[in-house]
Structure formats: structure tokens, C-alpha cells
A protein has these predicted regions:
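N-terminal charged segments
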Residues: 1-77
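A short helix-loop-beta-strand connector motif used in the catalytic cores of GNAT acetyltransferases and
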Residues: 24-31, 38-43, 88-89, 113-121, ...
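C-terminal "cap" of GNAT-fold acetyltransferases
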Residues: 89-99, 181-184, 200-213
Length: 213
């Protein structure tokens, strides 16, 4: 069994808000987002491996489509034809919802921009150099964090903790679950902040064999 599909829908709906994408719709036993962006046409997010995932993998034979699974990379690999290639691993995580506020380290300034349910935080040095940024979005069912990025030269200084704290202060519904998807490096940080991994998050696509240009 995969994770609760309602959690996936809540996260994916808020993620679409954060990125200005269409809301997810139910399709083939999964949730589909019609991204229609450079390099990506559509993506499907499955809660578990099922017959529809296998059938979809066999029916698609061109680049531009992403199949995502709240499950292991090995399970996704086994469900798809050989033309599909796995992406770098990621993890679906849930936050503590009651995290203590974290101060911004000396020498940095935060700027917060709110656009309806979406908030962006940018951290800069005294010289005005952008060194970290992140987004959050809130719906009735979830508060999600998205695109949390810190310049490698400024890591291990508490910027990640401060970023999450600043974004989290925009949350209105205190009981809503806090969700995000992270890389293995990010997972270690969030575990120290009290987050828990609820599932691996695996991705596959068919690579574009055309030469660039």
C-alpha cells in the first residue's frame, strides 16, 4: 500500500498553486497535472504501483511526460518498460506543525512577498547578494513548502532553518499538515527540524534523444 491519496492530493494542489500550474485532476488511478512547460507536458503522481501505472508506462513512448510514485525507485523501475529512466531520488516528508521560530543569522536580511495563498521569502547578504529563497502555499487541506534553495557557499549557517521558520509564520490554519518533497541532502536537514519521511518519492521519464540545438 502507498500513502494516503488524500495527502498526495492536498500536497499536489498546493504545489500547483505555488507554481502557477493547473490543479491536479484524477486520471488513470493517479493525479495528473498538465504542466505544459518547457521540457514537460504532463505528470502523473501515483500513490502506489497499480495496473494503470504499468499501462500508462507502456502507452507513452516520447519525452515530456513524468511518472511519479510515492514508493521506491526499484518498484517504479520494475513497473515500466526499459525506455524509462529514473531520476535522482527524493522523499515525501511531513512536518511537526509546531516548530519553534528560528532567528535569522547575523549579516542577512529577509524579504517576504505574499500573493494570495502563496508566500516567497528571499534572504540576502548585507551587500544585497541573494543567497537563499523559498516558497510556501496554503490551502484548506495543507501547507506546503516548495523550491527551498540555499547557495552552497552559505550553507550550514542556519539559513535553511530560518527560511522554514519565516515561511511557516505565514501559515493560517495551524492544524493543516505541513508537507514537502526533498532531496537526500535536504532530508537530513528537515529530519533535524523534526520532519518525518512518509514515503520515498520516485520519478521516471523517457529521455530526449535529440541532439541539442
Amino acid at each position: 500500500m502507498g500513502i494516503d491519496p488524500h495527502i498526495i492530493r492536498a500536497w499536489l494542489t498546493a504545489r500547483s498553486l505555488a507554481r502557477g500550474l493547473p490543479a491536479p485532476i484524477a486520471d488513470r488511478g493517479a493525479l495528473r497535472v498538465d504542466t505544459q512547460s518547457d521540457g514537460e507536458i504532463q505528470r502523473w503522481v501515483f500513490a502506489e504501483v497499480n495496473a494503470q501505472l504499468r499501462e500508462l508506462g507502456c502507452s507513452l513512448d516520447t519525452p515530456g511526460y513524468l511518472l511519479k510514485l510515492c514508493g521506491s525507485a526499484s518498484d517504479l523501475r520494475a513497473a515500466l518498460p526499459l525506455a524509462w529512466q529514473l531520476h535522482a531520488p527524493a522523499y515525501f516528508m511531513a512536518g511537526p506543525c509546531t516548530a519553534a521560530r528560528q532567528p535569522l543569522p547575523p549579516g542577512y536580511t529577509a524579504a517576504l512577498t505574499q500573493n494570495g495563498p502563496v508566500v516567497q521569502v528571499r534572504l540576502t547578504t548585507a551587500a544585497g547578494e541573494l543567497v537563499a529563497s523559498g516558497f510556501a502555499a496554503e490551502t484548506e487541506h495543507a501547507f506546503i513548502y516548495d523550491r527551498i534553495v540555499t547557495d552552497p557557499a552559505h550553507r550550514r549557517r542556519g539559513l535553511g532553518r530560518a527560511m522554514m521558520s519565516l515561511l511557516g509564520q505565514a501559515k493560517q490554519k495551524r492544524t493543516a499538515p505541513e508537507l514537502l518533497v526533498v532531496t537526500p541532502d535536504g532530508r537530513a536537514l528537515y529530519e533535524r527540524l523534526g520532519w518525518q519521511t512518509i514515503s520515498p518519492y520516485s520519478t521516471a521519464s523517457i529521455p530526449d534523444a535529440r541532439p541539442p540545438g
